[in-house]
Amino acid sequence: MQNEKITQELIDIRNACGSRVVLDGKSHIAPIDDKAFFDKCLIYSESKNLHAKNTVAWRPMSDDWKERCRSNSFWFQNTVAEAKKMFPEMDERLFELKARLLDFAGDAVCLPGYEEDLDDILEYGQFWLGYNAERMRGEACQCHANSARIWEQNQDKSVICTGYALSADGMWRQHSWLIHRKPRSNKIVETTRPRVLYYGFALTPEMCERFADENF
């Protein structure tokens, strides 16, 4: 169990790393918790809102791909009971995460057998749009190491985030990225390929240090 200091640090960094939104006529940085909040607020500004929201789009999965996933993958099953027939050790909260992601966007969530950050993702997670992410190209399929390297070089203005990202093929996958902290807004820093949407939590400085030690 986390102590109160770490819990407050995670809450503070979560709020600080939110998105620029306009709600009730006021512009501020706030976490996008879910689709309901996303729908009722303006993203960035009134002039940018429609374009920003229209970027949350993806190619529907083909029937053949769905059938392969259904036959081979616990995470594609419709219920916890069905998933546990294929993977009895599954943490049932993974399906809570799956529902949270698919309620917002996408067709499927490629879940791991074990998600070591599940508690923090569920407790402190938020959504970010990916269409205007800064690109700092790293090694392919090495998002954790890439993010660790960039953070090591930019600790004063960046924060590592980890969780899941939605690709244009409609699949959410495990992913890590960074937030570039700016005076008036925050921007995703993507080190591999473009993503439609992100969901995860921002790490505290101590967590970033540990993440970098383990991944870079």
Language-model features and meaning:
Residues 2, 59-216:
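A structural boundary/capping signal
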Residues 2-64, 69, 138, 210:
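Short, glycine-biased loop/turn motifs at secondary-structure junctions and
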